[in-house]
């Protein structure tokens, strides 16, 4: 896999990078490519945000954490100072990197590194910067130059170095390297112990913390929402208070106006009552004469209405006599209609027998229905006294009695024929 790193404004590509490749190995490969020694730091930049990567961090894993924003993240190699063994005169002789795209593979150190289980990763001390002394050297060379720097400088600056001093220096370096190796072994054992102890709970803790972060984000969003709602409600409350104050002022003004109007009404009522009493006294005198005249008129009207009532009674009696005669004629017509209906039934029966040749039993009309029809006629006959309206007959005679010759069933007894 390829990793793009910006070095002095030039984009360089490091090949052979995997998820277990550390930032220290990437820095060493780039330092070899540009041919400069010194102290370097690998920076992860996204927009205006920068983060220094530790030597033991994996740049591929760090980029994968950005998700969809990984393409916007830049890795920058920045030189923060000279190396420990770099002479002061070497600063003036610095190579200028070429402004071209350069590919550099990882040094053999990454290939020869022993295979370790991914679940047990070595945690080195967190440092914000890296020191490179030219080439991919072993751990003994990197960590063995701490305390002998002053002594080595004195030995190198002294032109009269003897063999004993060189042997002494070599012996000191060997002893120091052995002690560092022992310390490294003990540190590695301790690191593996603590990693095995806490690695099982680490993922659960990470998941728990991520869930807690999500819950906190949701709570923060809810708090922001309710804060906005609170501000809106406070503004509404302020507006309502102002409106309430205005309404109270208007109510006070209306009450004052109402009191003034009530006082004016009382004065007007007192004046109206005085005028009313005065008019009543005047009208009482005038009304006596008018009442006498009206009484005379009423008596005359009563006499006239009495005469009219006599004439109406005579007319009512004449109408009743004519109504009785009409009722009698109507009864005669009803009887004639019943007789014709019976004859029509006989004719229909004879036609039915001639057409079908079946025996037919003829049932006579029920007397109850005939009596009910006569009762209806008698019920319609009486005339209400005092009314000039003539009650209409509930039966209507056919205009042409020849219509009865058609074979139809009688309305008095629709079920009178049984076959």
From Swiss-Prot:
<dbReference type="InterPro" id="IPR029071">
    <property type="entry name" value="Ubiquitin-like_domsf"/>
</dbReference>
<feature type="modified residue" description="Phosphoserine">
    <location>
        <position position="129"/>
    </location>
</feature>
<dbReference type="InterPro" id="IPR033593">
    <property type="entry name" value="N-RASSF"/>
</dbReference>
<feature type="modified residue" description="Phosphothreonine">
    <location>
        <position position="131"/>
    </location>
</feature>
<keyword id="KW-0160">Chromosomal rearrangement</keyword>
<dbReference type="InterPro" id="IPR048944">
    <property type="entry name" value="RASSF8_RA"/>
</dbReference>
<dbReference type="InterPro" id="IPR000159">
    <property type="entry name" value="RA_dom"/>
</dbReference>
<dbReference type="GO" id="GO:0007165">
    <property type="term" value="P:signal transduction"/>
</dbReference>
<feature type="modified residue" description="Phosphoserine">
    <location>
        <position position="105"/>
    </location>
</feature>
<feature type="domain" description="Ras-associating">
    <location>
        <begin position="1"/>
        <end position="82"/>
    </location>
</feature>
<dbReference type="Pfam" id="PF21712">
    <property type="entry name" value="RASSF8-10_RA"/>
</dbReference>
<dbReference type="InterPro" id="IPR048945">
    <property type="entry name" value="RASSF8/10_RA"/>
</dbReference>
<protein>
    <recommendedName>
        <fullName>Ras association domain-containing protein 8</fullName>
    </recommendedName>
</protein>
<feature type="modified residue" description="Phosphoserine">
    <location>
        <position position="387"/>
    </location>
</feature>
<keyword id="KW-0597">Phosphoprotein</keyword>
